């Protein structure tokens, strides 16, 4: 399962906080998929030779992302180790990514919410760099929109990541980490 973090609503589209949603939108459109709606999230499914890939976009605000997991667990019978969370990172330069097998919630409230509900941080995450915070107020920065040049760079990154993430598995995870973490757009 790939969970893209973001805030629902048009007012948040193309903001730095919504790169998780933007990447999932690219994967969905590139593969001719459609979103289906549940009470707390939207999702799409792909059947692959290696199994199915479920793409999820929460309908909750970022800081409440963990609240959808009771529904997800009952709907899809998933295991935490098969979860990949895609989110923004203000400490990474724009266009740089970091794929990690597990880790702490750090200061990201979306991850804190997920880890709190799951009772574990034993899941993978893909951090997408959204640029350095030149503003003092982190909230204003992550809710700000990208400029055209930044969007162009991110479009290339989303194309690359959509190809790389579709066939990610336990068997090839280390190779994907190396390829994704060494990329720069």
UniProtKB/Swiss-Prot annotation:
The record marks 7 as: Discriminates between blocked and unblocked aminoacyl-tRNA. It comes from the Bacteria. Pfam families: Pept_tRNA_hydro (PF01195). GO terms for biological process: protein quality control for misfolded or incompletely synthesized proteins; rescue of stalled ribosome. The active site is at 17 (proton acceptor). TRNA binds at residues 12, 61, 63, 109. SUPFAM superfamilies: Peptidyl-tRNA hydrolase-like. Keywords: Cytoplasm, Hydrolase, RNA-binding, tRNA-binding. The record marks 88 as: Stabilizes the basic form of H active site to accept a proton. Monomer. GO terms for molecular function: peptidyl-tRNA hydrolase activity; tRNA binding. Hydrolyzes ribosome-free peptidyl-tRNAs (with 1 or more amino acids incorporated), which drop off the ribosome during protein synthesis, or as a result of ribosome stalling. One of its GO terms (cellular component) is cytoplasm. Its main location: cytoplasm. This is Peptidyl-tRNA hydrolase. Belongs to the PTH family. Its EC number is 3.1.1.29. InterPro entries: Pept_tRNA_hydro, Pept_tRNA_hydro_CS, Pept_tRNA_hydro_sf. It is found in: Cytoplasm. It catalyses: an N-acyl-L-alpha-aminoacyl-tRNA + H2O = an N-acyl-L-amino acid + a tRNA + H(+).
